[in-house]
Amino acid sequence: MNSDGVSHNTHTYPKRNNGDNFAVSPNNSTGVAVSFVVAENRPFRIGCDIHGWLQAWQLALDHPHGRRNTDGGKFTIESIPAGQHRVVIWHELAEILETVDVTIEVDGTTSLNKAFDASKFKLP
């Protein structure tokens, strides 16, 4: 979709899937379907070749448990099966990529608290 009054060129840069590169016309409310064959192991950049300052990040998963945190840094993931799981924490600006192993008990709730140096999140 493109709610802007100008065209954009969407260019994806996945590592494991084929990238896409297509134009999206102004005020396009339909959008363009993009699919991925395999899951990616980390987010990949999406850019606009017309407007080089525009970018976004996407993560193609093979499960429904991906989440973005709130402005306060919190998130909830529901319906995770019991067992050992790996949580991946990623942030493009602070260049954070960490993994944390967690155990989910049957019908249980697990909390994960991580703190990061706030100075890493300042705009360049």
Where in this protein do the model-derived segments appear?
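Extracytoplasmic copper-binding redox domains, predominantly the cupredoxin/blue-copper superfamily
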Residues: 1-124
